[in-house]
Curated annotation (Swiss-Prot):
Pathway: Cofactor biosynthesis; thiamine diphosphate biosynthesis; thiamine phosphate from 4-amino-2-methyl-5-diphosphomethylpyrimidine and 4-methyl-5-(2-phosphoethyl)-thiazole: step 1/1. It comes from Leuconostoc citreum (strain KM20). One of its GO terms (biological process) is thiamine biosynthetic process. This is Thiamine-phosphate synthase. 2-[(2R,5Z)-2-carboxy-4-methylthiazol-5(2H)-ylidene]ethyl phosphate binds at T141, T142, S143, G172, I192, S193.
């Protein structure tokens, strides 16, 4: 799939480790897809995450659901899985191997890479084949146990000024700070708990759409 930066507008990330069980995962994903997310990243990582055949079987269900709603699907740091289920994109962190090697294996997948500061961005800025950058954490987050120190709105703004890639902000983004993030002119925001722990996903996403 050809990447378009408008995909980054309302980016939802989730794995089974973020919710009670697989049934809850699928219920939340279905609601989020119906309610207007523009991109979904399947991220199984951390304590309690699925592996092997269980991960593959759930990923196939995720692929079917995202295809039904015409929402692009990104796989986090699992190239074999991304190709096996015909995902649309792949995402890598700073510790997920060399970007050049990952891009060589990506085929027709679009590629996202995480950075948390200007130095990390400058190291990958001129690597061909990167379609967008995930910048963060913007705020403190409990969704990722290995999260780096938050860079704040000022850190995000600085990266937006120097970057020549589309940027999606991530990390600790909730309804009460979303407007501050969007005011930087960033291409989109990526969230986990803002949707996965929402008591009303449809209302949460309607509010998000109204701010953009």
């Amino acid at each position: 799939m050809i990447f378009d930066k408008t995909m980054l507008a309302r980016y939802f990330i989730m794995g089974t480790q973020d919710v009670a069980d697989e049934a809850e995962f699928l219920r939340i994903l279905n609601q989020a897809l119906r309610s207007g997310i523009t991109l979904f990243q399947y991220r199984e990582k951390g304590q309690g995450a699925l592996v092997g055949q269980k991960k593959l079987q759930l990923a196939k269900q995720v692929r079917a659901l995202t295809a039904q709603y015409h929402v692009p699907l990104v796989i986090d740091d699992d190239m074999a899985l991304a190709h096996a289920i015909a995902a649309d994109g792949i995402h890598f962190g700073q510790d997920d191997g060399r970007p050049v090697d990952n891009i060589k294996q990506s085929g027709n997948l679009f590629v996202g890479v995480s950075v948390s500061n200007q130095q990390e961005y400058q190291r990958i800025a001129h690597v061909a084949g990167i379609d967008h950058i995930g910048v963060g954490p913007i705020f403190a987050t409990t969704s990722k146990s290995d999260a780096k120190p938050p860079i704040g709105i000022s850190g995000l703004s600085q990266l937006i000024r120097i970057a020549h890639h589309p940027i999606v902000a991530i990390g600790g983004i909730q309804r009460d700070n979303l407007s501050k993030v969007l005011s930087t002119g960033v291409d989109g925001a990526a969230v986990i708990s803002m949707i996965s722990q929402s008591g009303d996903i449809q209302k949460t996403l309607a509010d998000w759409r109204n701010r953009t």
